[in-house]
Amino acid sequence: MNPRGFEVTGAWFQAGGNIISAIGNTRAFIGEENVEDPLVIVGESLQALGNVLQAVAPEHSINNEEDEKETTGQLDESVQEKENKQSDDAKEQKENNIKPMREQGKSLEKTGAEVQALGNISDIIGTILNMEKEQKENDYLIITGNSLQSLGAFLEVVDELRDVPNIQWLEVIGNSIQTLGAGLQAFQGIYNVLKEERMEKENADDQEAANKKEGEKKEVDEQLLGLIGNWVQAIGAVIEAIGETVEPQS
């Protein structure tokens, strides 16, 4: 598979995984909590696979470009000998200036995809451990996972914006939306953990009656925030996948 194939396939795996995770959280929101964790695990696994494919693509792209240059250089060797030496030196200098920038961009894109993949893995581990026994440490893993996904998507936005002559705006918009969506989920997780810690410090006997009334509403509000973030991230992933698909080949 060529580098572009890796990127497009990875983007659609990521989009599909986000949609599956969002469906799992939606079903939990309407009361079907028993199906949430398996769907989230499947969804996050697909996202991780998609991000790995996208992380591999830049490496293949750089290697292919170098191979092409080497082949072209060999074929045109006799022609280049006839060209003016000064012109050759100027071209070489210009190419040497552009190459590090291109490789740096590829490196940032690769880093963003790798960070998102780590976030997916952290989410998977936290969810699996919570299925066995719900603990605060597992929630920290999920918060870390969502935060890493938000950071990784942001790095990919920065990478796209640096490619000034050829900015792919669909990918910029898609990754920006993913940054927001994953950030909302991380915020929800942090809020939940802080609320639990605060309630542990309060006197359970004094607060029991008040918490009984407000607990259900607060829980719904918190779940709704995470659910919105989940679907926002899924929409962003679909937009990014469309952007990758329609992106003109360089």
Stretches with model-predicted labels:
Residues 9-26, 42-60, 108-129, 140-161, ...:
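Membrane-active amphipathic alpha-helices enriched in small hydrophobic residues
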